[in-house]
Amino acid sequence: MLYNKLITIAALLVPALAAPQGLDVRDCDYTCGSHCYSASAVSDAQSAGYQLYSAGQSVGRSRYPHQYRNYEGFNFPVSGNYYEWPILSSGSTYNGGSPGADRVVFNDNDELAGLITHTGASGNGFVACSGW
């Protein structure tokens, strides 16, 4: 009788264990080095940077957002004056301190130009993140 109960319990548990759990799955629309960013995270970072830009304000020692001069010659899908703003792998909004390696680039019309990173670049240069 105990054996029958164990079989019944095991039969009920197996499908429950095999069922997908509520894993924290992140959309990976862009990849900068080993960091993965969703489109909404990029949009949030861009919005934070553009709000400061349009208000004539900046934060941090490097005064972000600041103009990005595109010395690397990226072929961005939008034109205009470009500005760079840190996007943090923690998901937090940059508010000063270390900016990390990854940047959102937008123009003066608040259009996303792309994502770039210092990771894998020589010197203080940038390379393109994948996904744009």
Swiss-Prot record:
Active-site annotation: 66, 84 (proton acceptor), 118 (proton donor)
InterPro entries the record matches: N1-like, Ribonuclease/ribotoxin, Ribonuclease_N1/T1
UniProt-recorded name of the protein: Guanyl-specific ribonuclease C2
Reactions catalysed, as given in the entry: [RNA] containing guanosine + H2O = an [RNA fragment]-3'-guanosine-3'-phosphate + a 5'-hydroxy-ribonucleotide-3'-[RNA fragment]
A GO molecular function held by the record: RNA endonuclease activity
Key word Transferase present: no
GO cellular component: extracellular region
Family, per entry: Belongs to the ribonuclease N1/T1 family.
The protein's enzyme class: lyase
Coarse class of the protein's main subcellular location: secreted
EC number: 4.6.1.24
Record keyword Nuclease present: yes
Species lineage: Eukaryota, Fungi, Dikarya, Ascomycota, Pezizomycotina
Compartment(s) where it occurs, according to its Swiss-Prot or TrEMBL record: Secreted
Span of the signal peptide: 1-26
Organism: Aspergillus clavatus (strain ATCC 1007 / CBS 513.65 / DSM 816 / NCTC 3887 / NRRL 1 / QM 1276 / 107)
